[in-house]
UniProtKB/Swiss-Prot annotation:
Disulfide bonds: none
Protein name: Gamma-glutamyl phosphate reductase
Enzyme category, top tier: oxidoreductase
Gene: proA
NCBIfam families found in the cross-reference section: PRK00197.1 (NF001221), proA (TIGR00407)
Record flagged with keyword Iron: no
Length: 413
């Protein structure tokens, strides 16, 4: 493991000094290799699925793990999308000239060596590799033991893509052991060779990484996402957005987990929204006010407001306007993604101002909380901390900066 850190440093230097065209070629070659290795990757995934089912995994958790031909094509297409994203390395984000003639530029640079610790989703292996190469960073990938065969098969394709482009395979390494001790070594910093650790998974994984890591951590908390239907909402729009936000794909972190209804119009808004959700197979758990309108709902507990279901279950609360919605979100949300449905521009602006989440949407589904949907090609996660990045983390967010100062012989008096 310690050797991985040292070779990753060498890989990071090679990526940093590579041309944008070389990095693009490597990412494109990764996508080609993933398609070429489709049979091997799907066979490996079948092994992971069989073991997961034998261990009692089912429902959304099994869905997160599963690949089929269509999903694998989506993985390859996602890698290609990253190749099409502008290369951020070396880009001057600002530039100015001082009165003494010094020319100063703020220039994007790679972070260095990134360690990615994640669970379940094998597509993260490809997304993280592509984004790190695009941003000039080396990466050490430590996926969960539940998808180790899938991850290693995808990594083999990625390594071949790097080789085809003439870049070192040390730039993207995968931890090949399921031993949990490997995570501890990464958290210890691998002899100070890791510049950033990114955890992506359940609350316990993120909490452990944040508590034990000796390197900086880019946090990705669970998606305790809310949709607030304001009194001035268009009812048809509200029904469509709420159903999509919850049920399009319940196992993603952008899935809505709580529905907030404005008490000023709850009697009108809640029944048709609840009816559409129930008909679509969603279980509703409401507070007293919500159940007074829709008695068929189960009673919501305090735990429901802080639970990322990742299942067709939705908590429902009636709140007092924008201020009440913002208070509920501040009390129970995770700072991930929250939305308002309204035709009132002032209410929308108030919601935007009051809700301090990484992503705030107006009249759109929370399922748009995705780097691909933001035009980033893919994402390495949704950062819920405020430093150093926030929201979908794409290639640009995986860079830092340096100041380049050009002079003509100036000395300081």
């Amino acid at each position: 493991m310690a050797g991985m850190g040292r070779t990753a440093r060498e890989g990071a230097r090679a990526l940093r000094l590579a041309t944008p065209e070389q990095r693009t070629a490597a990412i494109q070659a990764m996508a080609v290799a993933i398609r070429e290795d489709a049979d091997a990757i799907l066979t490996a995934n079948a092994k992971d699925l069989a073991r997961a089912e034998a261990n009692g995994v089912s429902g959304p958790m099994l869905d997160r793990l599963a690949l089929d031909a269509a999903r694998l094509e989506g993985v390859a297409a996602g890698v290609e999308a990253v190749a099409a994203v502008p290369d951020p390395v070396g880009v001057a984000t600002s530039r100015w000239t001082r009165p003494n003639g010094l020319d100063i530029a703020r220039v994007r640079t790679p972070i260095g060596v990134i360690a990615m610790i994640y669970e379940s989703r094998p597509n993260v292996t490809a997304d993280a590799a592509a984004l790190c190469v695009r941003s000039g960073n080396a990466v050490i990938l430590r996926g969960g033991s539940e998808c180790i065969h899938s991850n290693l098969a995808i990594h083999a394709a990625i390594a071949r893509g790097l080789q085809k482009a003439g870049l070192p395979t040390a730039a993207v390494q995968a931890v090949k052991t399921p031993d949990r001790a490997a995570v501890g070594m990464i958290l210890a910093g691998l002899d100070r060779t890791i510049d950033l650790i990114i955890p992506r998974g359940g609350k316990s994984l993120v909490a452990r990484v944040q508590a034990e890591a000796r390197a900086p951590v880019l946090g990705h908390l669970e998606g305790l996402n809310h949709v607030f239907v304001h009194a001035a909402a268009d009812l048809k729009k509200a029904v469509e957005v709420v159903v999509n936000a919850k049920l399009r794909r319940v196992s993603v972190c952008g899935s809505a987990e709580t529905l907030l209804i404005d008490q000023a119009a709850a009697d009108k808004l809640l029944p048709p929204i609840a009816d559409a959700l129930i008909k679509a197979g969603c279980e509703l758990r409401g507070d007293a006010a919500a159940r007074a309108i829709e008695p068929t709902m189960k009673k919501a507990t305090v735990e429901d407001w802080t639970t990322e279901y990742l299942a067709p279950i939705l908590s429902v609360a009636v709140v007092d306007g924008v201020a009440g919605a913002a208070r509920h979100i501040a009390s129970y949300g995770s700072g991930h993604t929250d939305a308002i449905i309204t035709e009132d521009a002032a209410a929308a602006e108030a919601f935007i101002a009051e809700v301090d989440s990484a992503i705030v949407l107006v009249n759109a589904s929370t399922q748009f909380a995705d780097g691909g949907e933001f035009g980033f090609g893919a994402e390495i996660g949704i950062a819920t901390d405020k430093l150093h990045a926030r929201g979908p983390v794409g290639a640009e967010q995986l860079t830092t900066f340096k100041y380049v100062v050009r002079g003509t012989g100036q000395t300081r008096p």
